[in-house]
C-alpha cells in the first residue's frame, strides 16, 4: 500500500458484513501498481446507518465508494444522479463523487457477464433462472436480457418488500428488450422445477450460503439439478458454497462470484480513476482457485 498523505484520496466499501471482502486487496494493490494516491477501506454500514454514512463521506470529500448487501437499493434515494443502467436496474453498487455530486452506477451486471464468459459460457438465446430480488439480482437480470437471453425467470418470496417493484421491473425489462422476464414465488415448487428444467443457467443472486451460514442453500431439493445445467453463485466466501458443491455432485458445471467481483471492481476502478485496473496481475494474485 502507498503511504497515506494529506492528499490521499479515499474510496470505500459500505455494507454489512464486509470483514470478509477482498475488495480492499484488489483496489489497494491496483493503486500501488499504478502509482495512484488513493486508499480503499471497508465500513460496516447497514440500511439504517447508510444515510448518515453517505452524508459524512460526502462531506469529507470521498472520491467514490462501492455498495454491497444490504445497501444497493437504499442508496438510490440518497444520490444526485443515476447512470442509464442504474436507472434501468433500480440499484447501485458504485458511486462517484463528482465535485460534490453523487452519481450512481451499477457494474454488477457487467461484472457477472464477464465472469460468465470467463467460465466459457454464452447465454445468447438461453433460458435463465435467477434466485433473489436484491440489487445484484436486478443487475444480472437486466444484463442477461440486454445480452440476448431468451428468458429470465426470477424467484423470490412473495412477502418480500421488493416484490411489487420487481414485478414492474420485469414488465419494463421485457418491454425494452424482448426477453421474457417473469417473477415467481419461491414457494411455487412446480414453477421452480419447470424453470430449472428448461434453463441453461441457474444463478443464486442472494447471500444464502455465505459465511458464516455455510450450511445453508437456496435450492433445498437437489433433484432439481440436471447435467445440462450451469450453476452460478454470486457468493465467493466460501469459494464453493453448499449450492455449488451439491450441483457439481449432480453433474452440473459451476462457478462462483469471484470473477464477478473482479470485473465489477475493475469497472468501478475505471469510473473513479479514469485508468484501467491491471486485471491480469490482480486476477493472478487474489483470484486464483484455492
Model-derived features with residue positions:
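Phosphate/diphosphate ligand-binding glycine-rich loop within oxidoreductases
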Residues: 3-119
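Rossmann-like adenosine-cofactor binding region
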Residues: 179-254
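NAD(P)-binding Rossmann-fold cofactor-contacting core
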Residues: 149-177
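Conserved S-adenosyl-L-methionine
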Residues: 146-151, 250-253
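Glycine-rich adenosine-cofactor-binding loop
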Residues: 15, 104-109, 125-149, 161
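Adenosine-phosphate binding glycine-rich loop
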Residues: 228-230, 234-290
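Short, conserved loop/helix-junction motifs that constitute active-site signature segments
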Residues: 4-7, 123-124, 146, 219-228
